[in-house]
Amino acid sequence: MNDSVFSKKRILLLGSGELGKELVIESKRLGLEVIAIDRYEKAPAMQVADYSKVIDMGDKNILKNSIKEFTPDFVVPEIEALSIEALKELEDEGFKIVPNARTVEITMNRDKIRELVSRDLKIKTANYDYIYKFEDLEKKADEIGFPLLLKPLMSSSGKGQSLVGSKNDLNQAWSQAQANSRGQVKGVIIEEFINFDFEFTLLTVRKNNGENIFCLPIGHLQSNGDYQCSWHPLEINQSLISEAKKMTTKILNNLNGSGLYGVEFFVKENEVIFSELSPRPHDTGMVTLVSQNINEFELHLRAFLNLPIPHINLIEPSATRVILSDQEHMNPIYEGLNEALEVENTKVLIFGKPISRKGRRMGVVLSSNSDINLARKNADEAARKIKVSSK
């Protein structure tokens, strides 16, 4: 077929959160058919997809049968909590997993990505080890030193992560990690706490021909491992960016699957330290909806669909601030939306989650300005005006 002819494709999305919702919207702009799957009804991406289905994605047989039911051209994981064995078997049968099943497996497990990056590729990370029994935790904590981080080997959005200040906090941190662990793995990763100067995300597009395209770096702040705000671009020494690009290229040359990757780094005393990697659009990258000519969701699609990706341009410096719920609500409503939208050059995205919980991310504010500090100030101001409540 002529390369200039684009036929309609069917995409099946595994996980239907807010990032998946934006991916569906961009997919529909290209005339694609989308099936959104998640473990609960009325998930954000389901609200804009052609079809949806609620299943237990951790059950290998259920997941395999559901994917075969829809016969998609591409299977696109958006979350970590799914059966990797199902994806491996489906890939062997000819289904296209984005970016590939091996990459999904490595990046969904903190032990596997650390072993690849630190042990195999010799890239700088925080000191770490794995613990599977609480009895071994105290000894290893003394070796790592306090403060330290304790995380489930598998979780998402920072869930179950604790900053541990002393031995007295280990029991609670262990319990929290176990309670928030996803999948069958119940171990934890114990990690040196790096008192970094700042952290950033390097969105990287991997094309089918192996070429990597880098977006400008995105600054961000997290709380307990969960994204709170981001700004784009981040002012940073070019030598640090060059080092981050070298690290990213080394990792992606090993993983070798097309799509968009969100690669997180720490910087401490002019040293770049690898933090985490996601083989999909990144929460900090939602800022690209207003900051770039091609946002991260469209970049992901173009990459795995093998569509052209011209030069990525910055439209205007921009910032985000998340909208959090302070308690649980069924069918939540949003107070202060009018006041928030009065803030100059500001947009509000409400994700449409059917239930709110304390600390749950329910929306995001996007703000643009030629002065990045003013963009950040406006995003913060608008987000403060919005309160999640119920009737």
Curated annotation (Swiss-Prot):
Binding site for Mg(2+): 264, 276
Pathway assignment: Purine metabolism; IMP biosynthesis via de novo pathway; N(2)-formyl-N(1)-(5-phospho-D-ribosyl)glycinamide from N(1)-(5-phospho-D-ribosyl)glycinamide (formate route): step 1/1
A Pfam entry, by short name: ATP-grasp
Residues binding N(1)-(5-phospho-beta-D-ribosyl)glycinamide, per UniProt: 18-19, 78, 283, 353, 360-361
Domain ATP-grasp: 115-305
Binding positions for ATP per the UniProt entry: 110, 151, 156-161, 191-194, 199
Enzyme nomenclature, EC number: 6.3.1.21
Enzyme class, first EC level, given as a word: ligase
PROSITE patterns attached to this UniProt entry: ATP_GRASP (PS50975)
GO terms under biological process: 'de novo' IMP biosynthetic process
InterPro entries (UniProt xref): ATP-grasp (IPR011761), ATP-grasp_carboxylate-amine (IPR003135), ATP_grasp_subdomain_1 (IPR013815), PreATP-grasp_dom_sf (IPR016185), PurT (IPR005862), PurT/PurK_preATP-grasp (IPR054350), PurT_C (IPR048740), Rudment_hybrid_motif (IPR011054)
Recorded GO CC terms: cytosol
Entry keywords, A to Z: ATP-binding, Ligase, Magnesium, Metal-binding, Nucleotide-binding, Purine biosynthesis
GO molecular function ontology, one term from the record: ATP binding
Catalytic activity: N(1)-(5-phospho-beta-D-ribosyl)glycinamide + formate + ATP = N(2)-formyl-N(1)-(5-phospho-beta-D-ribosyl)glycinamide + ADP + phosphate + H(+)
Tree of life domain: Bacteria
Stored HAMAP family: PurT (MF_01643)
Subunit structure: Homodimer.
Similarity-based family: Belongs to the PurK/PurT family.
Primary role: Involved in the de novo purine biosynthesis. Catalyzes the transfer of formate to 5-phospho-ribosyl-glycinamide (GAR), producing 5-phospho-ribosyl-N-formylglycinamide (FGAR). Formate is provided by PurU via hydrolysis of 10-formyl-tetrahydrofolate.
PANTHER family in the cross-refs: FORMATE-DEPENDENT PHOSPHORIBOSYLGLYCINAMIDE FORMYLTRANSFERASE (PTHR43055:SF1)
Protein name per UniProt: Formate-dependent phosphoribosylglycinamide formyltransferase
